[in-house]
């Protein structure tokens, strides 16, 4: 009866250990995640963008999206010299080295240390001894500790590569946005230059009419002069913004701050019809989302490692020593000694360290899962924002174009009326100010549309190719 009970206990323990081994050797599988509704519909009744799940906009090579040769040259320079990208590449090298070490941990380790002594007792003949020991140790991975560590190192390498791709995409989008910012500022500077001349002419005309006593008072001349100075202030601000943007772009492409050669805003050709791709395609394209999932996988294997530490560890060590007995030198060089030891260690009480380690690993897994979920939601939000920004800026630009046509005619009409003294100076100044502000706003909205395209491309994982 006692033997039967012992047999049942042994079988039960063996079954529990085998079931535990199965879970310890398990591979990471992607948890369920909600992908429907990640991208919100655009707010316009008639969609300007073609949103479907065909070939995604983010899969297009960046050279096909940004066709300006000057911009392409700046992007190439950034990819070669940007410090964040260079550091990301070094992170990949470090992860590769760690993975190599994790793979080699399955093999035995060997150590060699030689030792020799010369001794003489009471002035007698010197005695020479030497030993050439080789020690080997092998940690047998019975319960997946080394395997989980290796798999964790593998996903860390993938995470490092994903981070490198994410930085690359961010750099490409950053260069494009700054380049287009410079083009916008150049066009605004051109508009301000034209308005500077117009307001100066208006001021001169009012001075002449005041001197000729043709119905223009000093207050009108002063207002025209102030309007002219306001334009000069705007010009100074734009010049400062150009210099600051050039400095930022120079830093991004890894060079000293200097002037940036560039094209013109009106010559830029960017896509106007897109397929965004949704759901899992969005998850696969976004390098930062995939990196967050690889962090989740790493934490999964860390939990496996923490669990495996509760199980016994098998260590096998061996040593071989070539030695002599001393004094006989080369004639009888010595003998070879062998020794082998195997040990099985079962943790019983480790001051709560094993339980604490498992709890920490599980908590880190939950944190990684939350971060992954947030990365998914952030990706969807960025796509939605880019779509809304594109449609909104396009709609505003069309309205402002009509408004500019009206204001240009208004400026011409007020100039003619002022010549015949049939309007006030205030109407003239107001018409000029309204025209300039609307023209500047239209340029800003045109830039916002270009920026939305860049942001949409980046939000869909563009820049990896």
Question: Where do the language-model regions lie?
Answer:
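Short terminal targeting/anchoring segments
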Residues: 219, 419-444
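Terminal intrinsically disordered/low-complexity segments used for targeting and assembly
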Residues: 2-80, 239-284, 458-465
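Periplasmic alpha-helical coiled-coil/stalk elements that build and connect Gram-negative outer-membrane
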Residues: 22, 155, 162-278, 389, ...
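Small/polar, glycine/serine/threonine/aspartate-rich low-complexity segments that form flexible
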Residues: 49-67, 71, 76, 113-135, ...
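Sec/SRP-type N-terminal targeting helices
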Residues: 86-87, 103-104, 140-171, 219, ...
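Short, acidic/charged, Gly/Pro-enriched secondary-structure junctions
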Residues: 86-104, 113-115, 297
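A short glycine-centered flexible hinge/capping loop motif at secondary-structure junctions
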Residues: 209-215, 418-422, 459-463
């Amino acid at each position: 009866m006692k033997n039967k009970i012992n047999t049942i206990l042994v079988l039960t323990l063996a079954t529990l250990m085998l079931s535990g081994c199965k879970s310890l050797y398990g591979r990471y599988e992607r948890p369920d995640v909600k992908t429907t509704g990640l991208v919100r519909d655009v707010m316009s009744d008639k969609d300007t963008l073609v949103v479907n799940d065909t070939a995604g906009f983010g899969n297009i090579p960046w050279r096909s999206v940004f066709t300006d040769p000057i911009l392409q040259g700046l992007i190439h320079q950034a990819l070669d010299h940007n410090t964040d990208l260079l550091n990301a590449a070094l992170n990949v090298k470090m992860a590769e080295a760690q993975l190599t070490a994790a793979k080699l941990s399955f093999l035995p380790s060997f150590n060699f240390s030689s030792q020799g002594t010369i001794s003489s007792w009471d002035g007698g003949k010197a005695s020479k001894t030497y030993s050439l020991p080789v020690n080997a140790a092998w940690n047998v991975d019975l319960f997946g500790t080394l395997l989980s560590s290796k798999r964790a190192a593998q996903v860390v390498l993938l995470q490092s590569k994903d981070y490198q791709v994410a930085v690359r995409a961010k750099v490409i989008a950053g260069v494009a946005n700054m380049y287009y910012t410079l083009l916008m500022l150049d066009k605004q500077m051109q508009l301000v230059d034209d308005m500077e001349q117009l307001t100066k002419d208006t001021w001169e005309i009012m001075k002449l009419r005041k001197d000729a006593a043709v119905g223009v008072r000093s207050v009108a001349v002063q207002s025209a002069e102030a309007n002219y100075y306001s334009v000069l202030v705007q010009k100074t601000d734009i010049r400062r913004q150009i210099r600051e943007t050039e400095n930022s772009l120079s830093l991004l492409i890894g060079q000293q701050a200097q002037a940036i050669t560039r094209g013109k805003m009106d010559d830029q050709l960017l896509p106007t019809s897109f397929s965004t791709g949704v759901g899992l395609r969005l998850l696969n394209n976004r390098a930062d989302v995939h990196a967050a999932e690889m962090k989740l996988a790493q934490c999964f294997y860390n939990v496996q490692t923490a669990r495996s530490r509760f199980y016994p560890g098998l260590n096998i060590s061996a040593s071989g020593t070539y030695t002599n007995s001393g004094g006989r030198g080369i004639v009888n060089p010595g003998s070879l000694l062998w020794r082998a030891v195997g040990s099985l260690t079962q943790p019983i009480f480790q001051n709560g360290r094993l339980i604490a380690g498992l709890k920490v690993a599980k908590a880190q897994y939950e944190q990684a899962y939350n971060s992954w979920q947030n990365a998914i939601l952030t990706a969807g939000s960025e796509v939605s924002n880019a779509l809304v920004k594109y449609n909104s800026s396009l709609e505003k630009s069309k309205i402002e174009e009509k408004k500019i046509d009206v204001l240009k005619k208004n400026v011409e009409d007020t100039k003619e009326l002022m010549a015949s003294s049939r309007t006030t100076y205030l109407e003239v100044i107001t018409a000029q100010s309204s025209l300039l502000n609307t023209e500047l706003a239209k340029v800003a909205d045109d830039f916002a549309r270009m920026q939305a395209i860049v942001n949409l491309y980046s939000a869909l994982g563009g820049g990896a190719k």
